[in-house]
């Protein structure tokens, strides 16, 4: 499990207004923590949900083109929906952000969290 991977993640049990169901999400927690959680089979990783609704892309979101990240359709990463999820909810890799988009997502997270 590596930072920048797009994986299918079970986001069920989300409250109204939050991204829910099984959907793509970008792993944004650090690789060291991700490796430990994966090895132990427990713990949490931090993810940013992805949606294919790209009608509007706000400054705290990042446009992900299908060709560039390896997913089925153009989408956006929603930094405003960042959350920690159990490793039990993490599914297979379906894409990967190049370094340029990881940097943009880092900036979107900084903007959203006012860091």
What is the role of each PLM region?
Residues 1-115:
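Conserved functional hotspots at enzyme active or ligand-binding sites that engage polyanionic ligands
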């Amino acid at each position: 499990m590596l930072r920048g991977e797009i994986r299918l993640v079970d986001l069920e049990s989300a409250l109204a207004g939050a991204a829910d169901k099984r959907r793509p999400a970008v792993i944004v927690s650090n690789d060291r923590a991700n490796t430990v959680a994966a090895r132990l089979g427990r713990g949490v990783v931090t993810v940013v949900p992805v949606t294919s609704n790209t009608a509007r892309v706000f400054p705290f979101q990042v446009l992900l083109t299908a060709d560039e990240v390896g997913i089925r359709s153009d989408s956006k990463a929603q930094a405003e929906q960042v959350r920690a999820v159990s490793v039990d909810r993490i599914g297979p890799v379906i894409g990967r952000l190049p370094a340029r988009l990881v940097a943009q997502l880092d900036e979107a997270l900084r903007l959203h969290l006012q860091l």
